[in-house]
């Protein structure tokens, strides 16, 4: 079953984890907008060179560079049976432009997924992350009962734990969440554009998931709704 999917969720919602699970289960590439920029810049593509001039100045890359870059990635052979796009769009105007560009390219969306999570819970999850020095993939979080560390040691292997500085920067977390949770000019505004399309035209399916349960429970709900 081909699925062209757009994924929304705040930092701390487990969006990246669920994206990785879908990638494995359905052999669907999980494409992050940030990775597209890095690949194009590293590869020295024309679009990458243009994007780099803006990034080097600390400016946002214009949509007329970003969207063609995304389309180029979605046209790659590994996306022929579907794809999962994460990290773009981030406002309603970008959503409209992306929707139009996808349709013109024959890459119309099938499904939009929104992981819903209370903002305070999302922030606590980020600040509660602890990284195992032996393996970053060992999940430890002081605010999630199912994966609480064993004291100050990794719950999986007993290794030492550390924190990432950006996970403890509450001001930076709040700034990212300000952008995401803004339903007028932020990321949720772009998600709701697609929700309106789903309700009015019925051409795409809009799925909402409760992000508060365990990873396993969220995955079960997601897989069930994708059937």
Task: Show the residue positions of the predicted features.
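Glycine-rich phosphate-binding loop of ATP-dependent small-molecule kinases
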Residues: 1-227
């Amino acid at each position: 079953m081909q699925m062209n999917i757009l994924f929304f969720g705040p930092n701390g919602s487990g969006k990246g984890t669920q994206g990785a699970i879908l990638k494995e289960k359905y052999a669907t590439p999980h494409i992050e907008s940030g990775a597209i920029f890095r690949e194009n810049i590293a590869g020295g593509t024309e679009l990458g060179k243009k994007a780099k001039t803006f990034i080097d100045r600390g400016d946002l890359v214009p949509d007329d560079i970003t969207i063609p870059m995304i389309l180029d990635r979605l046209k790659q052979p590994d996306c022929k049976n579907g794809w999962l796009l994460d990290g773009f769009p981030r406002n309603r105007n970008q959503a409209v432009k992306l929707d139009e560009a996808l349709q013109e390219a024959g890459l119309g969306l099938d499904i939009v997924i929104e992981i819903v999570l209370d903002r305070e819970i999302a922030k606590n999850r980020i600040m509660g992350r602890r990284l195992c020095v032996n393996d970053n993939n060992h999940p430890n979080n002081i605010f999630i009962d199912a994966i609480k560390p064993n004291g100050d040691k990794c719950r999986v292997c007993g290794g030492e734990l550390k924190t990432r500085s950006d996970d403890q920067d509450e001001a930076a977390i709040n700034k990212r969440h300000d952008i995401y949770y803004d339903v007028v000019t932020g990321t949720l505004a772009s998600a709701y554009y697609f929700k309106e399309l789903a309700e009015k035209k019925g051409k795409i399916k809009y799925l909402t998931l409760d992000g508060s349960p365990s990873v396993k429970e969220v995955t079960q709900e997601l897989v069930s709704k994708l059937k």
